[in-house]
Amino acid sequence: MSLSYSFNTTIFTENRDLVAALQPQTNCARTALTLIVSDCGKLSSFNEDQQLRVSLAVGLAVCEFKAAQVTYPDACNNIEDWMSTSACTQQLVSSPQWWTTYHGCYNSVKQICHMHEASRECDRALKTHSQIVDMQEKLHTKMDQYWELVETMSDHRDAVLDYWNDTFDFMSETLAHMKETSVSLNAVYRDNFAQAQEHFQMLSENLQEARVQMENLGWAAQDAVVSLSKSTLAEQSLVSERLKNDASSLHKLLVLAHQDTTESFETQLQQSLTILVESSDNVLLNHVQQVSSRLSALMSDLEESQKKNMDMQHQLQQKVRTINDDIEGFTDTVKQGLEASHSLLNLVKSKIQLVNGVVSIFSRPVRSAFQLASFIIMIRAAFIGGIYTSIGLVMGSMLGVLVMQQV
């Protein structure tokens, strides 16, 4: 039995190449935000959480310093906890330029976070899509392994069927040969019984002849007695001697005839029995041994086949359970992809609202130097991340359509 299963695996490579092409370029501000906060929309207590706000502002200020190629304190390079963050801010106070940049990031950190949210959502969507592609590849790999197991079981089943067919053919040939042997043995039995019947017939004829001679001897003896009663003593003696000689000759004849017949019958019977025993014992013993050895081998192969079938069933059950688990994981990943697409749509809506807010800020008059500095810093941040944000929006939209097509 031949089974066939094929799947074009180049689709996985093409999807990975597409994901690599859609990956946005690295951005310092986006990286800093990602390390600290995962979702800007979840910052409901953002104004109250000063530590989080300070940590984000320090990370964004460091990105500003790097972009402008401005030296900054070494304490701001390794921000791991609140103590290191405080040490960084204490050194930023020592320089007006450092402090102005930090303070501007502190005031506009939420807006900057939302500006980079699109590219971050694009990264998450691409990561989810990569997970879906990996899960699909694993699923098809499991399906290939499952199909190979099915083909192996099919080949094993064909081998078992062929073996049983050969065994049944051998049994049929053995029974036919035993039937022929039985017919031959019956013919030997009939021949031997026919010969025995002939020997018994000869013995019966010899006995009949001996009885006739005995009757003749009796009549002769009776005649001799009558003649003796009429003859003299000398004649009686001669007649008696002749009767004794005739009786002795007849006895010898009977003994010889009986011995010849008995020996001939025993010899023939012994030969017949020898032929019967040799033919029946040898033939039947050989066939019984062949059948017994064949049945023993058959039982051994059958036990081995049962063990193999049990092992294959166990492997098949494990494969099915693994495939079910992979399908469940694949379903969860697809759900995550859908959620990422919906989040991307919501993010686009929030970006529109953010643009409207920026427009409204542009329409207001500048009332203080502090507001002007904050406004300039926000414009610089928007200029730095604006290009990547636009690219992120376009790629996010494309990825949303791609994920929906994959689902």
From Swiss-Prot:
The chain crosses the membrane at residues 383-403. Pfam families: Tht1. Residues 404-407 are cytoplasmic. It is found in: Endoplasmic reticulum membrane; Nucleus membrane. Glycans are attached at N165. Residues 1-29 form the signal peptide. Required for nuclear membrane fusion during karyogamy. This is Nuclear fusion protein KAR5.
